[in-house]
């Protein structure tokens, strides 16, 4: 019973190590200093949209990996 608990704790820490960096990376925003010569545009930044969609797919992939490992651990 002690070994199973250690294995579950290790798996939990591994999942945390996999998911935490993706959360930190996806929540970072870059702020550009405002200059009086620049006009404010209402159009979205295409590079920002690409980064967000890539981040979303990375999160879903990490989530699927976590779910797969959890199910594997339960049934094996």
UniProtKB/Swiss-Prot annotation:
Transmembrane segments: none annotated. A lipid is attached at residue 56 (GPI-anchor amidated serine). Residues 57-76 form a propeptide. InterPro entries: CD24. Extensively O-glycosylated. The carbohydrate structure may be regulated in a tissue-specific and developmental stage-specific manner. One of its GO terms (cellular component) is ciliary membrane. It is a lipid-anchor; GPI-anchor. This is Signal transducer CD24. Expressed in the central nervous system, in postmitotic cells of spinal cord, hindbrain, midbrain and forebrain. Expressed in epithelium during the development of non-neural tissues. Expressed in tooth development, specifically in mesenchymal cells differentiating into odontoblast in dental papilla, as well as in the developing eye and hair follicle. Residues 1-26 form the signal peptide. It comes from the Eukaryota. Its main location: membrane. Belongs to the CD24 family. The keyword Membrane applies. Glycans are attached at residues 27, 37, 48. The lineage of its organism: Eukaryota, Metazoa, Chordata, Craniata, Vertebrata. It comes from Rattus norvegicus. GO terms for biological process: apoptotic mitochondrial changes; apoptotic nuclear changes; apoptotic signaling pathway; B cell apoptotic process; B cell proliferation; B cell receptor transport into membrane raft; calcium-mediated signaling; CD4-positive, alpha-beta T cell proliferation. It is found in: Cell membrane. Keywords: Cell membrane, Developmental protein, Differentiation, Glycoprotein, GPI-anchor, Lipoprotein, Membrane, Signal. May have a pivotal role in cell differentiation of different cell types. Signaling could be triggered by the binding of a lectin-like ligand to the CD24 carbohydrates, and transduced by the release of second messengers derived from the GPI-anchor. Modulates B-cell activation responses. In association with SIGLEC10 may be involved in the selective suppression of the immune response to danger-associated molecular patterns (DAMPs) such as HMGB1, HSP70 and HSP90. Plays a role in the control of autoimmunity. GO terms for molecular function: carbohydrate binding; Hsp70 protein binding; Hsp90 protein binding; protein kinase binding; protein tyrosine kinase activator activity. Pfam families: CD24. Disulfide bonds: none annotated.
């Amino acid at each position: 019973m002690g070994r199973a608990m250690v294995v579950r704790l290790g798996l939990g820490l591994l999942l945390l190590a996999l998911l935490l960096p993706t959360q930190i990376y996806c929540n970072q925003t870059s702020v550009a200093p405002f200059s009086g010569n620049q006009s404010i545009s209402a159009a979205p930044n295409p590079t920002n949209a690409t980064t967000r969609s890539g981040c979303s797919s990375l999160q879903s992939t990490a989530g699927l990996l976590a779910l797969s490992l959890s199910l594997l651990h339960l049934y094996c």
